[in-house]
Amino acid sequence: YNFDSRSAVLQHTWTKSPKTIWLFRFSASHSLTSSLEAAQDKLDYPHQLGLKGLFSGIFPTFRFGNYLGLGPRNNSVFKESSYAFTPYVSGSLNRKAHTVRLTHTTRRNFDNIFSPFAPAGYFTFGNAMTALPGIKNTGNAFASFLLGEVYNGEESIVRHPSYYRKNFYNFIASDEYKVRPGLTASVSVNFEVASPRTEKYNRQSTVSFSHINPANGKPGALIFAGREGIGAALQPTTVRAEPTIGLSLSPFSNRKTVVRFSYGLSYQSVPLYGRHFGTQGFNAAALFISRNDQLESAFRLRDGVPQNFELPPFLDPTAANGTDADFVDPSGRLPAVHQWVVGIQRELP
């Protein structure tokens, strides 16, 4: 694959006085990653193989049990272009026994990606179709391939790239107080505000358990961003405060020994889900599974790939039925980490 990365940083330090220093920084970065297989699309390998029903010209993927397979690996066709812009401001103010630090960071992420899982199909062949009835360890997966009897298969249909956006804001205030020689206390509070992932054209979806699926009348239906009263984001904006306290002391006025105690609370962030997670309905992942792998294949290669599914865009509550549905947690709950640290530092002779 091809990889290109660029970044630029602009920084200025302003010393207002010996006790007050400000730092201003702005950074921008860009990375572009693309696969070489993307150029194969124009060759239309499925047509050359006589395999009908596929929506990409990439060479299909065939797997035969323990044999070496044919075709590219999954997600071999991709192009991802990511941008990040990060303004940063920090100030340090010394006032007698106090050192106060103020920090603010804003980060804007843009992730533009095209990466179908199996653009020209992923087809698996097993030994059951060529095995003798009731006799174990018979049959051959490659023989099933020669007969064209597909055990199971999947085809990814991604019509458009996904253009994800996410913002992050961070505010930190800390104070380091020298109580007396050999004793220092510190406290800080980190406020973080993180916006959820959005898509430039609202091409996002998730399973909602508060919506009824019309296929069976039970909770669990696909919902779509920007439709039927649903906002552009499928998760809430998270706001959290992360406090930290610490104490360092030199016992018995011994400057060669320092004991440190600290406690901190932090939260993990909701990731910027990449690839095409949470885009069902706008994209499709057609599955083909044998109902009885000893008697009937999912389909025969000579008949072409079945077309018994809705082509995207299919913005319907039932669009994820019968698939491995994507779920974007709408609760806004974040994993919390409580950390206690005790350390002893000793200067050796």
Language-model features and meaning:
Residues 1-349:
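Short acidic-glycine motifs
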